[in-house]
Amino acid sequence: GQLLKNRHYLSHLGKRLALYSVVTDSMSCYKLSLNDELVNVDFGEIVSAVRQIKTGYTGHIDNLFRASNYLVSPLNNPSRFIQGEYFLTQAQEQVKKSVLSGVDSVFLSAYFHITGKPGTGKTLLLYDIAKTLSKNGKTVIIHCGKLSPGQYKIRNEIDNLNIVSVSELRDESFSLSDYTYILVDESHRIYTEQFDAICDSVNKNDQICIFSSDPEQVLSASETRNDIVAKIEALHLDGQFTLSEKIRTNRELHSFIMCMKDLNHRPKVPMDYSNVVLNYANTTQEAQYLLAYYRSKGFKFINYTKSNYAPSPFSAYAEDFDTHHVIGQEFDKVVMLLDSSFFYDEDGKLQGIPHPNPNYLYPNLFYQGVTRVREELALIVVNAPELFEKIASIVTPAES
């Protein structure tokens, strides 16, 4: 298994690969064949292969491995997900094993809960578990946002696996009782009545329910008030698991986002923020020009979800996605806007003015958008010099 993973990771380098394994207890030597079979070889072959290497690699090895080559998002890479062209991390594998073991050991209704911060791989893990469970019974994933084309492709091509938006629970044509397994992604976003409807069905029909959540990713005031995560944890859970290691965002971007949320945050080691570009626009028109430039370079513009009833400062910008459309998705390059709707309070925390829809919270919408990025982040600050100055102090810290 490990050699197969090594081949997967190294194949992106475009080099000829020779993959060996040595069992030190017995000094048995194996080579992974092109047919993915282990073949016995003698130790001399490995020595000979090593001697044929004329020059080693002296650069920074991390530069050879871009996250976008390895991280599969079911929503953004549905074909690779359907074909199984991905690996779970050790942490994901362990949680999956524990969940499936728990599912196997219960005969009546049961609840499981997976938590983790953005970028820890909750969505891929939940979809992978759903794909496995669908081989054993009808399975539905409830998505707490708007469905993407990738989700339609998955539900059309994987037998016994349906994906629905949480809003479809009200439809007369949809019945939760049809399913053996119910999985809820981003469950911290659902309303109390939706949560109650899911639990009622699970209890009445002896179903298995798996919730996935991140309490830090609430987008609205009502989501904060509902506190669905507390309601989940108050259930008689058959298993609760946490994903802690971040796999989507590289560590520099993660550090920058943490510093943006709180100016007092200090990374443990010096960080190179060269994959963050900060721009200033004096006017909306200048911002539009910058957006056009970044889009031409392959960046996805994530705008803030708008109110249905009142204009917002960001209504003038036509987005690729809004912050509710990107729930669960990820992109190599992201560009976002900030203006005087944002400010830092006296404690150095990023705050926002009231959104035209009082249910939405600007800092939370920003966090939802900015945590979708994998490789490069561009920020455009529009006519807000104080905000720009504070963010610039993160990108180019003063010499101590």
Could you tell me what each predicted segment is?
Residues G1-L64:
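Accessory nucleic-acid engagement/destabilization modules that flank
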Residues P78-T120, L124, I129-L161, E168-S177, ...:
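Conserved helicase motor core of SF1/SF2 NTP-dependent helicases
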Residues K300:
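Bilobed periplasmic-binding protein-like "clamshell/Venus-flytrap" ligand-binding domains
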